[in-house]
Amino acid sequence: WHMNNEAGPSMALKVPEYPTTFSMQALHYSKEIEGGVIVVGPNGKRFCNEKYKTRHGKVPAHGTWKALTTPCPMHLIFDQSHMSAGPIYDGHPSHGWTQIVVQYDWSEDNNAELEKGWITKGDTIPDLAIKIGLDPSALDSTIARWNADAASGEDTEFGRTLMLMPLSSKGPY
């Protein structure tokens, strides 16, 4: 037994209707799903390698392990290609309270969750930013940088190597 450690946070969807979170397919370190996807904090900027496999929510930092940076609220930003690729929820039943106990049946096309307000849709990046309370120019700048990195095949900010796909230049998002 040991009590000198705690599990760190993870990036997941929390909705008012359920006490626990929903894991997102795009954030799973081993999944490759069509479409452009990034996670931003309340300043509209990326803050980590979204696909990094954490160890109980911890990441290596200068010879030690620290909790993954998780500014709140966080927003999973994705394009229509990702929305259409199948359920964004990782419903694999082998882990997590929501998967095992709640057994929520996420829709195959994500539209039921869009209708519930769990997913916010914007026709343009600035439109989406306004709807989710972000600075439109900050989010637009972040996506422009991500798209340039994805097109070059190198994430110059955080070294992400999986799902290096730009977000579409056409909405919706």
What residue ranges belong to the model's regions?
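Residues forming the flavin
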Residues: 1-144, 148-173
